[in-house]
Curated annotation (Swiss-Prot):
Its main location: membrane. The lineage of its organism: Bacteria, Pseudomonadati, Thermodesulfobacteriota, Desulfuromonadia, Geobacterales. One of its GO terms (cellular component) is plasma membrane. This is UDP-N-acetylglucosamine--N-acetylmuramyl-(pentapeptide) pyrophosphoryl-undecaprenol N-acetylglucosamine transferase. UDP-N-acetyl-alpha-D-glucosamine binds at T10, G11, G12, N124, R165, S193, I248, Q293. The keyword Glycoprotein does not apply. It is found in: Cell inner membrane. HAMAP family: MurG. The keyword Cell cycle applies. Keywords: Cell cycle, Cell division, Cell inner membrane, Cell membrane, Cell shape, Cell wall biogenesis/degradation, Glycosyltransferase, Membrane, Peptidoglycan synthesis, Transferase. It catalyses: di-trans,octa-cis-undecaprenyl diphospho-N-acetyl-alpha-D-muramoyl-L-alanyl-D-glutamyl-meso-2,6-diaminopimeloyl-D-alanyl-D-alanine + UDP-N-acetyl-alpha-D-glucosamine = di-trans,octa-cis-undecaprenyl diphospho-[N-acetyl-alpha-D-glucosaminyl-(1->4)]-N-acetyl-alpha-D-muramoyl-L-alanyl-D-glutamyl-meso-2,6-diaminopimeloyl-D-alanyl-D-alanine + UDP + H(+).
Amino acid sequence: MRLLIAGGGTGGHLFPGIAVAEEFLSRKKGNEVLFVGTWRGIEARVLPKLGYRLECITAAGIRGKGSVARAKGLAKFLYGYAQSRKILKEFKPDLVLGVGGYASAPALLAARGMHIPRFIHEQNAIPGFTNKMLATVAERVFISLEESRKFFPEERTLLTGNPLRRQILEQVALAPQEERTDDAFHLLVFGGSAGAHRINLIMGEVLPHLEDVKERLRITHQTGENDLEDVTSAYEEQGVAADVVAFIDSMADAYRWADLVVCRAGATTIAEITACGKPCIFIPYPHAVDDHQRRNAEALLKRGAGFVIIEQELSGEVLAKTIRDLMADPARLKSVGEAAQGLARLDAAQVIVDEMMTSKRKEK
């Protein structure tokens, strides 16, 4: 069988698609996967390195833009639609999955016109414009969080969770945390592959408020390239043991090491946090479309599976107090981690592939 996965732009859209691709290829020798994305998206850098085929089309957003920009966006969409039809005719997929992002719309709509079974996956609590529109033409809508169900047709919507790459599933979700005999407290801080400038800055303000517990603290902080030197200097000046890096090669190892995580609330991050059963202080990115990161984090908060500090209320003192309180309450840390793990859907990729294949068999 052949599967075409359309979308990307960000890791939050792309990585669930990669997880589904891994599962689909593992089912039967001879299965094939083709990704469709754009040259501007993260897929253009990531997929070739992983050995996946990628076709790039022209696509752009039109939401919330002026009339001239909308006209240009529409022209790009029509061109991308024509490109998608050509790709579909050449690849001849049995199934098409949209994972969100600009490229998913022309590809899914072209698949509809060619009567190819099509599906979408929504990663966030608040769906993006593209997926809300594509839900009208998709045979199945797969969702990561129960909160997004109300935006889609009930009879065609299935809660699957957010698919995770096998690296995470194998190295973290299935591996026990190392036993430690010392009193060290491991804090993992990160903000995605590019870092998060606000989180990087705030940690410098946090440290003076943790002076009396800094001997216990062991921090791994992923900053991205831009803030690496400044953050490194901040930890050195405060005398706090910290491993400050631009990138973390193995998030699986980092999660396993951590007692507490401080990070943004992107969909993939939340899926990884829950799979690992890690207590986390989420600081949602305030400029995400439809404020979806805050909604993602609140979905865990209301289930006792995480902590949330919105940026408008963020200060060094507030974050330090939250960290200090949790350092002093291992039972609470444990219960929140267990609640997070209770929300994990480790079989998300399997369920999605099963559903797509079942739909294809019914078609026959």
